[in-house]
A protein has these predicted regions:
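Conserved ABC ATPase "signature" region
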Residues: 68, 104, 108, 115-132
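Helix-to-loop junction immediately C-terminal to a conserved catalytic motif
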Residues: 52
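The feature captures the beta-strand-to-loop junction immediately N-terminal to the Walker
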Residues: 37-39
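ABC ATPase NBD coupling module
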Residues: 15-18, 69-85, 109-114, 228-232
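Catalytic Walker B motif of ABC-type/P-loop ATPase nucleotide-binding domains
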Residues: 162-165
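Conserved signature/switch motifs of ABC ATPase nucleotide-binding domains
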Residues: 136-139, 157
Length: 338
């Protein structure tokens, strides 16, 4: 688990200080992936450096597996860092070493005996799908394959957490999908707590269990990913699964409906309309993939006379989650447009 408590980082001397991280709180449980998103200058890179204490926070704590790294001396901090695997946009591979030799480096530095190193490297390359490429040099590998070598190296010392800082930036869509798929496997198989820092919103829906939005050094939104997608007021949800094609509600009450496409019957709208005895108007819809699962969003226009409890019950029985939109959309006549 990763726990960041009131994490603050400032530069300069008072009164001319610049605050890059401002009392930031974030928890990444074991066996989960939390994505941190935000514009350039939001503080994402500084956050990554503070998690590993490559940059020491001005105040606050960085707790990894129950241990506050900010309270450790140099020797114990080196030991604690072994529990944090890191992967970056640059794979950082040594060009004159093979894939196997690159993965072996942390084991060699730690003094692991050769026989155990060989066995561990073979396990790791197999884990990341590169068992047949152990003797290849970095220039003989694709960008996605090099990043997989970097992941194998990050796992060499059996960390409990993994920090991914823009690790998929610059990769083509196929390579990106393979890396996010691998991270999900590592989450499930090894129970890792993964902090996934990125500016690529399309990647978030493929990998994250939760998402936090960072702006000006502060977390302004943080929630499980599906909750973010269900929130019509969420800027992150709107960016990840846009509400496309919303039409006129004609004086109807607007409802937002969310669902996992694989669990919902194709005729849910017509079936619910027949059951309720009211026509439900489809104003807009979109479908996407979130962490490997199909999810959808629909905007409905619902007659004001319809009992909301009956509507939610009818949709719940079909595997849909519904909530009213913040306001009722007036008809064109009410707006004096006709």
């Amino acid at each position: 688990m990763i726990e960041l408590r009131h994490l603050t980082k400032t530069y300069g001397e008072a009164p001319h200080t610049t605050t890059v991280l401002d009392r930031l709180d974030l928890t990444v449980p074991a066996g989960s992936i939390t994505a941190v998103v935000g514009p350039s200058g939001a503080g994402k890179s500084t956050l990554a450096q503070c998690v590993t204490l490559l940059t020491r926070p001005t105040s606050g704590s960085v707790v990894v597996s129950g241990q506050d790294l900010t309270q450790l001396g140099a020797g114990r901090l080196r030991e604690a860092r072994r529990r944090i695997g890191t992967i970056f946009q640059s794979d950082g591979l040594q060009t004159r070493r093979t894939a196997a030799q690159n993965v072996e480096l942390p084991l060699r530095y730690l003094g692991v005996v050769p026989r155990d190193r060989t066995r561990r490297v073979a396990e790791l390359l197999d884990r990341v799908g590169l068992a047949g490429l152990a003797d290849r040099y970095p220039h003989e590998l694709s960008g996605g394959q090099r990043q997989r070598v970097g992941i194998a190296r990050a796992l060499a010392l059996r960390p409990g957490v993994l920090l991914s800082d823009e690790a998929t930036s610059g990769l083509d869509p196929q390579a990106t999908a393979s890396i996010t798929g691998l991270l999900r496997e590592l989450r499930d198989d090894l129970g890792l707590a993964i902090l996934f820092i990125t500016h690529e919103m399309d990647t978030v829906v493929d990998v994250a269990d939760a998402v936090a939005r960072l702006e000006h050094g502060r977390i302004v939104e943080a929630a499980p990913l599906l909750d973010v997608l269900r929130d019509p007021a969420s800027p992150v949800g709107a960016a990840l699964l846009p509400r496309r094609g919303v039409g006129d509600a004609g004086g109807l009450v607007v409802w937002e409906v969310h669902y996992r496409g694989d669990d919902v019957p194709a005729d849910w709208l017509s079936a619910a309309s027949r059951e309720l005895g009211h026509d439900l108007a489809l104003l807009g819809a979109s479908v996407g993939t979130v962490a490997g699962r199909t999810v959808g969003h629909a905007t409905l226009g619902v007659p004001a006379a319809l009992d909301p409890t009956l509507l939610t019950a009818a949709l719940d029985r079909r595997g849909l989650h519904a909530q009213t939109s913040p306001s009722t959309v007036p008809s064109p006549r009410e707006l004096d447009l006709v």
